[in-house]
């Protein structure tokens, strides 16, 4: 486990620090493709929201639940509660639920932050949410890596 002091502000990777009981969101993460201040909310929740929600689940996963609020090593929750809580806090589901709840409020500011983008008018807001989520994990692999690694089932 690393503490907050071991991270650089220019990192573009969120993390949960069990030692500090804190979510680390370095400044390097608050830029494209993860965040854009004026981007529609479906893109922000689909990308950065999902990433941060995922990292928050580490507070209750197997290693994370062994630290208390002061960073001391001990089991603070019974395993049965841990399993049910972890299932409910899945990053993608939590971010999607939060975004949908925000939309349900229906004020004009929320509506304005969910306008469709030019060139993407054929997609629904829900589709764009999941496209933003998928874009987080997309990358271009060199051909030799694609051919040397057969497709595998990974959770």
Spans of features found by a protein language model:
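Zinc-dependent metallohydrolase catalytic domains
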Residues: 1-49, 56-155
């Amino acid at each position: 486990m690393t503490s907050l002091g071991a991270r650089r502000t220019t990192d573009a990777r969120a993390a949960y620090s069990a030692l500090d009981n804190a979510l680390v969101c370095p400044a390097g993460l608050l830029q494209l493709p993860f965040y854009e201040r004026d981007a529609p909310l479906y893109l922000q929740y689909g990308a950065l929201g999902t990433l941060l929600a995922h990292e928050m689940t580490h507070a209750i996963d197997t290693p994370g639940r062994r630290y208390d609020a002061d960073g001391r090593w001990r089991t603070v929750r019974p395993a049965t509660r841990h399993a049910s809580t972890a299932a409910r806090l899945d990053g993608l589901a939590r971010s999607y639920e939060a975004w949908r709840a925000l939309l349900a409020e229906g004020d004009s500011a929320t509506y304005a932050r969910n306008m469709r983008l030019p060139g993407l008018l054929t997609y629904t807001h829900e589709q764009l949410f999941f496209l933003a989520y998928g874009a987080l994990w997309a990358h271009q692999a060199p051909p030799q890596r694609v051919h040397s690694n057969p497709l595998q089932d990974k959770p």
